[in-house]
């Protein structure tokens, strides 16, 4: 869901901070710290490892409480409209929908978080053909389980499918499932992810909109600075690497 909207800095980070405060935990995640923590896949794993670096041991019960309270605050922030679509998302999804292209969400977030986001943005974008969340698989990204399940449910051929991702973990998951991948790193860690985009068919800072053109960080040039169906189709013919 971070590929669709800036869910991390505007949604998950402040929700974690509210949960920490409620539970009297001595953590405050500012943007710089959270940016570094994003290298760790999985929200609770992030909390656990950060606590350990601070010399704080959290029991499983405490971690469960953080998860539950954070989820409440995240859902509330989404419903209040604090989380916004990234550039080009609405335009591209509408184009793909008109062309009859199957569109699936594959995310490491839980079902409740994803459905709250979709409920908030449903008037702006077309419906997706399916959703695979962390609740549906044994292992989240960078494991390929989610993408493999989406391919199975959709009946799509991996050679004719393409993933659009925002993280190194997502890129690894897509590649392990046999998919080519367009990487659009989060604006908060674009420098780090552009360094790790070696397995991506292309790396752009976002999908691009009129007046807000995308910048190609690696890969094929993008006409008029906007990712289109034609551009995505061209990435399917990029030699695998």
Report the location of each language-model feature.
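Short, surface-exposed acidic
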Residues: 24-35, 55-66, 124-128
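Short, surface-exposed alpha-helical segments at coil->helix boundaries
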Residues: 10-14, 44, 111, 115
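A non-catalytic, amphipathic alpha-helix used as a structural packing/dimerization or gating element
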Residues: 11, 15, 65-73
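Active-site neighborhood of HAD-like aspartate-dependent phosphohydrolases
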Residues: 1-32
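Helix-loop "lid/cap" segments that line or gate small-molecule binding pockets
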Residues: 19-21, 42-58
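Conserved phosphate-coupling serine/threonine residues in phosphotransfer and NTP-handling enzymes
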Residues: 3, 107-109
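Asp-based, Mg2+/Mn2+-dependent phosphohydrolase catalytic module
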Residues: 94, 110-241
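Short, acidic loop-to-helix structural element flanking the phosphoryl-transfer center
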Residues: 75-105
């Amino acid at each position: 869901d971070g590929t669709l909207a800036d869910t991390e800095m505007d949604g998950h980070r402040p929700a974690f901070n509210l949960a920490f405060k409620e539970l009297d935990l001595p953590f405050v995640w500012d943007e710089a710290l959270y940016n570094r923590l994003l290298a760790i896949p999985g929200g609770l794993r992030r909390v656990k490892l950060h606590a350990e670096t601070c010399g704080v041991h959290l029991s499983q019960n405490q971690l469960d409480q953080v998860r539950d309270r954070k989820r409440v605050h995240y859902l509330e922030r989404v419903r209040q409209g604090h989380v916004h679509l990234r550039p080009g998302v609405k335009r591209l999804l509408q184009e793909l929908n008109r062309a009859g292209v199957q569109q699936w969400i594959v995310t490491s977030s839980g079902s409740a978080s994803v459905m709250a986001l979709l409920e908030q943005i449903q008037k702006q974008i077309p419906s997706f053909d399916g959703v695979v969340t962390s609740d549906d698989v044994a292992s989240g990204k960078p494991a390929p389980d989610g993408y493999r399940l989406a391919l199975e449910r959709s009946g799509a051929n991996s050679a004719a499918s393409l993933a659009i991702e925002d993280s190194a973990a997502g890129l690894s998951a897509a590649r392990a499932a046999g998919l080519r991948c367009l990487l659009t790193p989060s604006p908060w860690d674009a420098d780090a992810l552009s360094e790790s985009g070696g397995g991506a068919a292309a790396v752009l800072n976002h999908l691009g909109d009129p007046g807000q053109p995308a910048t190609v960080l690696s890969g094929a040039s993008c006409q008029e600075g906007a990712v289109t169906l034609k551009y995505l189709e061209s990435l399917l013919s990029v030699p695998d690497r």
